[in-house]
Amino acid sequence: MLEDPVNEVKRREHALRIIGEKMKKHGRDGIYDLTGLSGGFPLEEEDLDLIETYVGPAIFEEKLQEAGREHMGGEMIAAFNRTSSAILAAVLALTEPGSTVFHYLPELPSHPSVPGSTELASAGYQETEDFTEKPPADTSLVVVTGSTMDHRVVGESDLVRVIEIAHDAGIPVLVDDASGARLRTVLYGQRRACDLGADLAVTSTDKLMHGPRGGLMAGRAELIERVKSKAYQFGLEAQPPLVAAMVRALEEFEPSEIRDAIKRKEEFLRDFRGPEVEETPTGFIIKSSSLEDLQGSGYDGDEISTALSMILLSEHGIVTIPAVGMPGASKTLRFDLAARDAGRIEISFLREAIYDAIKLVSGFINDDEKMRRLILG
């Protein structure tokens, strides 16, 4: 059902309609976004008169450079309308048609933005989990994922090794640190990617922080300039309102909120009697393979996770990625307890909601029409 890209769009739009309906009935307090991607637009009143096409950049660019370098390191900062946009601009700027983009990940597969950008650049693409493997001789760009969509984190020694391998071959390194810029540094005590020698690093300002959905890139000034040039060419750069919100989010970032998630996770797991869960740095995931009552139904793991996610949303107001994520995003049922809403949801309420979702889906998983309506509307 979800292999069809059109159905992926229908699935997401159905979930957004459910959120809209719940907002009308219960207001924002009836929604608990546990995706870790809820973002925010923390503008101050004084910012509103400045978010114009030309005035905005004149005011906020200097602040962006200062706050961005403090968060990411590097010589220069650039802002993009999404992390995927930043990756696309970097691949277009730094690769040659026919060359190879070589991608290291803690766990396969890649976020679709990396192979997709490579295809648009008419370059070849290879990915590996082996951080000792050397890239092919025709490699023009090495990409390293600092933390996967399911929060698998690269070890600092592996990251350093890959950077050294690439630099020995004269290849620039881009670290996709979408959530890793905070996970790696705050919870694992790792250094910032640019401090480890990465030429470029990019993070999402809505992941594990309260900023807007946007991409913040740091790195060597000469490369940032090339990437920015390509971004302007294709309209990938962040606009003034987004840049202003990024600046405020960076200024307000509080690492302790991520650390508090560990306490919430421990409280949840202590009395949870449901299916087997797998811990993540800031929460937990439920894999469809652990849901024995739902196996053998003819539905694959992605569809089962999405069905559960839809019930959690429609019945309990709990937002998770399988329901609302962009087409192609991971369908792992992940609960991020570092999310802003995690601070106001009762842990017992979350447990009971999960039990209820499993029970309801078990009751009609053999009814194809009900499953289709549940997932696609």
UniProtKB/Swiss-Prot annotation:
GO terms for molecular function: L-seryl-tRNA(Sec) selenium transferase activity. Gene3D superfamilies: 3.90.1150.70, Type I PLP-dependent aspartate aminotransferase-like (Major domain) (3.40.640.10). The keyword Oxidoreductase does not apply. Its cofactor is pyridoxal 5'-phosphate. Pfam families: SelA, UPF0425_C. The modification N6-(pyridoxal phosphate)lysine is found at K207. InterPro entries: PyrdxlP-dep_transferase_arc (IPR020033), PyrdxlP-dep_Trfase (IPR015424), PyrdxlP-dep_Trfase_major (IPR015421), SelA-like (IPR018319), UPF0425_MJ0158-like_C (IPR055177). Disulfide bonds: none annotated. It comes from the Archaea. Keywords: Pyridoxal phosphate. Belongs to the UPF0425 family. PANTHER family: L-SERYL-TRNA(SEC) SELENIUM TRANSFERASE. This is UPF0425 pyridoxal phosphate-dependent protein MTH_1914. It comes from Methanothermobacter thermautotrophicus (strain ATCC 29096 / DSM 1053 / JCM 10044 / NBRC 100330 / Delta H) (Methanobacterium thermoautotrophicum).
